């Protein structure tokens, strides 16, 4: 599984960046993830200075993101070309979708409204609207201020109970009761959708995303709108019928 994720991520990034350098592309804006920043650490606050600990036994996804991004920076830094690089590191991306594919972040929200997650989990996640992510890429491409920068995109961090509260306030059925870490781990043995989230139970981490505002001028879409637009997309693609 690790090879399936890591090798394509690193080699794909290497091919694209190498070709861009060969063609003397003026600037590259690379989509990475906060997963390249925070995995494998015990601390709770992160900035663009941090990197996931790829030498530790971390999951394949954050390892692939960190190694792919490191490869891009390595190629740029060793090149004698004038090509500039900006890396965008989004938190959990939500909002309106163009396809029926569901990400791990979206899976939590869909589980809360379709009943597959019957109780609020002790999960604390950073969220950002897909429209803000798209805008950040455009602004990064146009701005020389972003040259050579990693930029975290995270509107806010919410516990699952906070997401459920927003859903209920907007007329959706969502859990009212919250599970402790112990109960959540126990339930994850019987509810498959919970297993991928086990490593996040009870961990509250925050990311400093001031660069997005200071360098790119990003003004985040209201998080409630992002969540509701996400749910409307899930409904449109038949992920639930509520």
Task: Place the predicted regions along the sequence by residue.
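Conserved Rossmann-fold NAD(P)-dependent oxidoreductase catalytic core, especially the SDR/UDP-sugar
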Residues: 2-61
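Active-site beta-alpha turn of Rossmann-fold NAD(P)-dependent dehydrogenases/reductases
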Residues: 29-32, 89-91, 154
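Mid/C-terminal beta-alpha module of Rossmann-like enzyme folds, strongest
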Residues: 136-195, 223, 227-242
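Conserved C-terminal active-site "lid" loop/helix of NAD(P)H-dependent oxidoreductases
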Residues: 188-219
